[in-house]
Structures are given as structure tokens and as C-alpha cells.
């Protein structure tokens, strides 16, 4: 049980004093209480109580930052991403959550954007897949805002002079908060998930590993990704909206 105690100690900084732990619960679930931001989580651990992962449950209201990375460029007008951004705003507010937003292509004020990250419990990055990654405007936004947030969003890279090879990426100050990707791709889902296809069965999140890691560098953890596929050759906008609302309900739940 030594590993379980070590994991619990690691979790305590995120869960806070109100966390409740039950070892040996059915299915290997460690039941925990409310996080500091009001959200509820369960922790599932492995047989040896040495591995765990978070599963999103219902919550009180959550402060959610919505970032619209849609952009008109080439054959893309950006409308689908704007529509999904607006769908998220309406659906989350209807569920009782609080939202702030930035339409990246319309410009932004760096101190205000840093303040939004300090305010949020979760951030949703809405963006198309361009040449196997985010649009340059979204990456530029991340570069500028995260850099402007030095000392507020992250303290350092997590290492110390005593252990210069250990702890890289652990200096984030937004621990206990979360990030989610909402993506639009012309590629079918099978291009990501099917072995032998373009991405070799690696999955969507593997394609976005650097983007996830950039968010994790400031301390956030990953929520389930949402993706709309085949958006140019076989668009199903009404179904995308229905699916997205269901995804948001599953991830965040009503306040």
C-alpha cells in the first residue's frame, strides 16, 4: 500500500482538504470529494494502487474560457468553428456555467487574456486542423499569452539545480484546472484510429501531443477531446452540433 499512500499524497495538493478517499471501493475506484474549484472527480487506480486517472463527474458551476480559433483562409471560411464556439457558449451557459471568450482572429489584449486563464477552471480550444496541427494564429496566441503569463501561469520549467534532469514541465501554476480541444478536420476519424491508415492508429490526441503538453506545462490536465470529421467532403453540421452538445453535457454536466 506504499504506492497508494504516495499517490494520495500527490493528489492531496490538487484535491484539497475536503477530499475523501475510500480504498478498496468496487471496481478499484477511489472516491474523492470536491476539488477547490467546486468540481467533483473520481479516481480509478490499478490493482497495485500505483496508477490512477481522473474521470469527470457532475459539478457545480465551472468557469470556462472559450477560445475561438476559427479563421478564414484558403478554401476555409472558418464558419464551422465559429458555429461550434457559439454552440459551446450557449450550451454551457444553459447548463449554468460561467463563460468568457476570445475570438482569436479578432485580436486580443495580453494582460486580459492572462487574467482569463487565471479566472478559468477549464479552457476549450476550438480550432480547425491545418497541416496536421493548429492554425498559426492559435499557436501565436498560445506563444504570446503563455509567455506574458510567466510567473502567473507557470513559475519555471519545474527543475531545480539540485536535480537538473528531473521534473521538467512541472512548474505550472494552474494545477487542478483543465483544458479541452474541440477540433474540425476534413480527415475521417478512421485516418486517426485505424492501423495502417495515415496516422497509424495513433489516435487524435497523439497528433496533438505537443499542444496538450503546452497546456500541461502551465498545469492543466486534459479533458476528452471532441472532433468533427470529414467536414469538407461530407459535412454534417446539424449532427456535429448535436454531438457537441452531448459531449459538453457529458464532460461538464449541469451546474
Predicted features and spans:
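Short helix-loop-beta junction
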Residues: 86-97, 215-221
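N-terminal beta1-alpha1 ligand-phosphate binding loop
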Residues: 62-93
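Structural motif
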Residues: 107-115, 233-240
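Hydrophobic alpha-helical membrane-insertion segments
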Residues: 1-52
Amino acid at each position: 500500500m506504499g504506492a497508494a499512500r504516495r499517490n494520495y499524497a500527490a493528489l492531496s495538493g490538487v484535491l484539497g482538504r475536503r477530499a475523501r478517499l475510500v480504498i478498496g471501493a468496487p471496481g478499484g475506484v477511489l472516491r474523492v470529494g470536491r476539488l477547490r474549484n467546486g468540481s467533483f472527480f473520481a479516481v480509478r487506480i490499478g490493482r497495485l494502487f500505483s496508477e490512477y486517472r481522473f474521470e469527470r463527474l457532475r459539478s457545480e458551476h465551472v468557469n470556462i474560457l472559450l477560445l475561438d480559433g476559427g479563421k478564414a483562409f484558403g478554401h476555409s471560411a472558418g464558419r464551422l468553428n465559429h458555429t461550434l464556439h457559439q454552440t459551446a457558449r450557449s450550451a454551457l451557459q444553459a447548463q449554468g456555467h460561467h463563460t468568457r471568450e476570445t475570438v482569436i482572429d479578432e485580436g486580443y489584449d495580453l494582460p486580459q487574456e492572462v487574467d482569463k486563464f487565471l479566472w478559468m477552471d477549464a479552457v476549450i480550444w476550438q480550432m480547425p486542423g491545418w497541416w496536421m496541427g493548429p492554425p498559426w494564429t492559435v499557436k501565436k496566441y498560445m506563444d504570446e499569452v503563455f509567455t506574458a503569463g510567466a510567473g502567473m501561469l507557470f513559475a519555471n520549467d519545474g527543475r531545480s539545480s539540485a536535480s537538473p534532469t528531473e521534473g521538467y514541465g512541472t512548474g505550472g501554476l494552474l494545477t487542478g484546472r483543465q483544458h479541452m480541444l474541440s477540433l474540425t478536420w476534413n480527415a475521417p476519424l478512421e485516418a486517426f484510429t485505424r492501423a495502417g491508415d495515415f496516422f497509424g492508429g495513433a489516435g487524435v490526441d497523439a497528433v496533438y501531443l505537443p499542444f496538450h503538453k503546452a497546456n500541461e506545462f502551465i498545469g492543466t490536465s486534459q479533458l476528452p477531446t471532441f472532433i468533427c470529421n470529414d467536414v469538407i467532403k461530407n459535412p454534417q453540421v446539424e449532427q456535429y452540433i448535436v454531438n457537441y452538445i452531448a459531449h459538453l453535457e457529458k464532460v461538464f454536466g449541469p451546474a
